[in-house]
Amino acid sequence: MRKIAAAALCLMLCVGLAACAGRVLSSKEENTMRAETQHETVELKVVTSYGADDGNRKNYENAVEAYEASTGNRVLDDSSRASEEWRYKVFTDFETGSDPDVLFFFTNADAEPFIRAGKLVSIEEVRTMYPDYATNMKPAMIARAADGKHYAVPSTGYWENLFVNRQVLERSGVAVPGPDYTWEQFLEDCEKIKQAGFIPIACSLSEIPHYLFEFLIMNNGSLENQLELPRLENGQLVMDETAEKWIAALKDMKQLYDAGYFPANTMTATDSETVIQFAEGMAAFLVDGSWKCGYFAESYPQNLENYVVCCVPGKGERPATDTIGGISMGYFITRKAWNDPQKRAAAVEFVSQLTSDETLSTFVKTEITALKSGAVPKD
């Protein structure tokens, strides 16, 4: 009789578990799952671009600490500054089976190889079990992949523009640029700055030349064709309007290099080194992004009055007030984590906490946000 009762109990448990596996979890069940993960430590491998010199590194560290404290889980942080080397490492890790559990990465075409390989889980799939996942985001601002699905929960946005060291300009006899700044004025100012013994443009051509180059492309084209890329046919460059725009931009870059407006070691210096040249008053101009605001505030609080954000000089159809910005990065949950029930819950909770209204508000200073309620910075 006891054997029959035990068998019946096992059958009831199996039926109950099978029923749970195929339906959406209620809020109560989600809370139960979160409570369970708090009692058994889960290690999450997380890859981000919040490296040591990133302006939001401290905010990221605080968010991770809060997550670990609230869940009892442990984050194995594998963060580095965004660069081609970092991007290459991310691709290599996926190719060699060293997938992270959560990835903070570009939401554009760079993520498509991972999506096509089935390495990432869509937000739609996550919501089959966690219906409230990423519902604090504006749907229109969640990047859509080529397959029509959405994978990345947006983080903070960004803008790119011209940082100016006011002190260097004053010592060079150059005025702070206005909203109608032209390419011709910029070249004249660079020459004055060079003659005064300063570096006109802080830029590492060997590591991160693209912030400046993006504007040079726009200066030789238009907003409408900014994202168009040159094409090859049979190994030969197709000489069309796009190719001509890129060639003209490269010529402008070469003009700046030949004139000696970059650091003497621009072909070997790291981006960090050239940013320091700007921050410490050795260089006048730096084309960079909003993420640098936090870096300057934390690393050079005594010099903040010297830094001004101005417009990148305009040329052709582009007025100086046309800039570059948007939301280009977000959090992905990998298939590796999703297929592990414990890591699944831990990863969902991690992304949910890192992209909550409260947490993202600590990251946002002047950037675009996808939060429905908007960001409310504390400072």
Model-identified regions with their sequence ranges:
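Extracytoplasmic/periplasmic substrate-recognition and gating elements
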Residues: V42-T48, E65-S70, R74, S172, ...
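Short helix-initiation/N-cap motifs at beta->coil->alpha
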Residues: S80-K89, A109, Y181-L187, N265-A279
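Extracytoplasmic/periplasmic solute-binding protein
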Residues: A146-S155, E160, Q185-L237, K254, ...
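Glycine-centered hinge/linker elements that transmit conformational signals in sensory
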Residues: E188-K192, N234-M267
